[in-house]
């Protein structure tokens, strides 16, 4: 007898095929259909991805592809120890881009041009030339004010603001690039 092949295709779209007789119960529980697409008869228009949407693979529940990664733990802060590198950032695994380095160096040069001094220079301390304290909070002699460029602290004249350092830093960066 004629019968529709059992699959996930709705019966109105299934093509009628002859079922061979004498199939075992196992073979009957896993029917096959050589052409699971809709019949070519009629004026039925289906989307091109119809077979993909109605395939057995689309019925399988899948796990979410979103995975949440936590950031690696930061090393513990040891009191009394400072990293003397001005390029040290909390995430050392992520390298700085050339633009970030140029921006940092431009702002360092801008602080020098605006008469800012590191804490060791402002307090006339005998520290190595390239030693940059991480902070200048409550260390700048009056009337100078504390300004930070990255992690480097500077004692600047009162008229110098962070925005002024940034703008002069842009000009310094263009000088470095030859612009």
Curated annotation (Swiss-Prot):
UniProt keyword annotation of Secreted present: yes
Compositional bias of kind Polar residues: 1-37, 60-70
Recorded GO CC terms: extracellular region
Region (Disordered) residue spans: 1-41, 60-82
Distribution of this protein across tissues and organs: Component of the acid-soluble and acid-insoluble organic matrix of calcified shell layers (at protein level).
Main localization, broad class: secreted
Subcellular location: Secreted
Assigned keywords, A-Z: Secreted
UniProt protein name: Uncharacterized protein 2
């Amino acid at each position: 007898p004629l019968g529709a092949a059992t699959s996930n295709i709705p019966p109105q779209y299934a093509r009628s095929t002859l079922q061979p007789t004498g199939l075992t119960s196992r073979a009957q529980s896993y029917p096959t259909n050589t052409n699971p697409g809709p019949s070519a008869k009629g004026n039925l228009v289906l989307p091109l991805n119809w077979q993909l949407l109605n395939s057995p693979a689309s019925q399988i529940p899948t796990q979410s592809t979103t995975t949440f990664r936590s950031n690696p733990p930061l090393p513990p802060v040891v009191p009394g120890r400072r990293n003397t590198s001005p390029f040290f950032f909390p995430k050392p695994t992520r390298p700085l881009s050339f633009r970030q380095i140029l921006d940092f160096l431009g702002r360092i040069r801008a602080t020098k041009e605006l008469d800012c001094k590191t804490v060791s220079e402002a307090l006339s301390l005998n520290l190595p030339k390239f030693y940059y304290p991480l902070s200048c909070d409550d260390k700048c002699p009056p009337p100078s004010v504390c300004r930070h460029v990255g992690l480097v602290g500077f004692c600047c004249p009162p008229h110098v603001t962070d925005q002024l350092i940034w703008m002069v830093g842009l000009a310094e960066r263009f000088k470095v690039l030859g612009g």
